[in-house]
Amino acid sequence: MNLLFLKIYRSREEPQRRGERLFEFYNQCSRLGYDEFRSFVNEWISQLAASDQAEIVSRMSRGGDRQFKSGLVELLVHASLRALNLKVIVHPALEGTTKRPDFAVLDGQDRVVAYIEVTTVNPPNLTDAEENREAPIYNAIDQIKLTVGCVFGYDVTRAGTSSPPLAPLIKDIDAWVKASITEKPERKVTRRFIAGDWELELDLFSGGSLQHDRAIGMTSGDVGWIAPHLDLRSALEVKSKRYGELEASYLIVVADAKGQLFGADSTKSALTEAVLVF
């Protein structure tokens, strides 16, 4: 049997690092609940045929976060169908095309009663590329040793096209911190830093009594429109035409990997708007 998570000794307690792959984090973390998560995923994989196990293990362990998330959704859907005592075929063949949907559900006479396709709404590729370039900057600042009671607020005010040299940036930040604490003992001071074609804004908060493990205590993210119904509609439009006319019901499962859906009400609202227009 192919396993995504092998039985190894794990002692890591730290949270996920900026730029770290989800698989690496979930494979190493020893916090409460993570053993159970790994056990669930391995059990779901064991329900697949051997060839399908190898494919999804390779995709989730060697690919990026998109591949990990999409594989996780596929496993969850397959396990849910199995839990309903349904007979499921993975990647069933279709006449007249080499394309294969994710699943087919069979009745008692082994006739296909439904095809199921899983898709994930992801952030744009540009966002992923920017995050990968930013990760070394963030992690270098996060590892700065601050005095007791100090912590950074962190924001990217202009993203660059490449990762800049880090040593001059960290040296500049260290000097600013020391000067701010001794010359301007205020609870909050702010400064912008230029590193290559990147522009960062740091807030230095001081006056507390805790020794923080990490230098960055809060971050500001990009502000953008939240329009999950548009993403749902786009996913439905693309997948609805993928296999042409089918002789059975066709169900499209859309997973949100952009963090736009916040609960049952927002999901229902987004789905209603998407389907009404679609």
Residue ranges and their predicted role:
Residues 91-93, 97-108, 112-118:
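Short acidic loop-to-beta-strand element that houses the catalytic metal-binding Asp/Glu
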